[in-house]
């Protein structure tokens, strides 16, 4: 069977790095290629806390309408134009029987004893990154709160064969901020990496 290519944003990228690291330790191939979207082993803790704060906002009370949710997102990301069509936002919210909208993620992800910490197991992430031998692309939002220029530089040192794209006018949510540029970059990488991935 053909191994998959993993495109992981934020927590998905962390999972991808760790999974590939475990594959490498076991002497298995794992993924054909890896695309990390605004995530590196070295994370800016202020940015992590800002993201967690946003995720925790209105967690219990929810929103009275999609418009209220859109206003909250606009305050968190003032540089992103507020969408006129909120149908896309509706996919990230759940309408409960009480008529209010709630984020689609499990509240225990934020409030539970196993809530994410940006500094959790940084050594494991570093080791996983060092084990990356497959084609790897790091896509950073130039306005990211999470991945600094220095963090991207350190990643390039740890994974010298990796490629790097810095997307202007994009924050941590690169695909949402500049979807056309993000998609083109990923497709270009996959097209060029296909021969290498098939023989690695």
Regions found by a protein language model. Name each.
Residues 62-120:
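Conserved alpha/beta-hydrolase catalytic His-Asp/Glu region
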Residues 95-157, 163-166:
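Conserved serine/cysteine hydrolase catalytic core
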Residues 167-183:
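Catalytic histidine-centered segment of alpha/beta-hydrolase-like enzymes
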Residues 185-196:
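C-terminal alpha-helix
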Residues 1-47:
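Conserved hydrolase catalytic core segment
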Residues 45-50, 150-151, 177:
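Short aromatic-enriched loop/helix-cap "lid" or pocket-rim segments at secondary-structure transitions
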Residues 36-78:
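Internal catalytic or translocation cores that form aromatic/hydrophobic pockets or channels
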């Amino acid at each position: 069977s053909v191994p998959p290519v993993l495109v992981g944003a934020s927590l998905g990228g962390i999972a991808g790095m760790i999974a590939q690291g475990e594959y490498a330790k076991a002497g298995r191939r794992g993924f054909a290629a890896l695309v990390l979207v605004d995530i590196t082993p070295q994370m800016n803790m202020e940015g992590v806390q800002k993201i967690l704060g946003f995720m925790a906002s209105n967690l219990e009370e929810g929103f009275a309408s999609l418009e209220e949710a859109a206003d909250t997102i606009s305050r968190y990301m003032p540089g992103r134009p507020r969408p006129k069509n909120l149908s896309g936002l509706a996919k990230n919210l759940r309408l409960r029987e009480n008529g209010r909208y709630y984020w689609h993620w499990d509240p225990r992800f934020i409030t539970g004893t196993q809530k994410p910490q940006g500094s959790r197991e940084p050594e494991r992430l570093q080791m996983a990154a060092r084990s990356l031998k497959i084609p790897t692309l790091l896509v950073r939002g130039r306005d990211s709160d999470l991945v600094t220029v220095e963090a991207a530089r350190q990643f390039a040192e740890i994974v010298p064969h990796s490629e790097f794209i810095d997307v202007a006018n994009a924050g941590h949510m690169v695909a949402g901020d500049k979807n056309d540029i993000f998609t083109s970059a990923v497709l270009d990488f996959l097209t060029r990496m296909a021969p290498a991935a098939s023989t690695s």
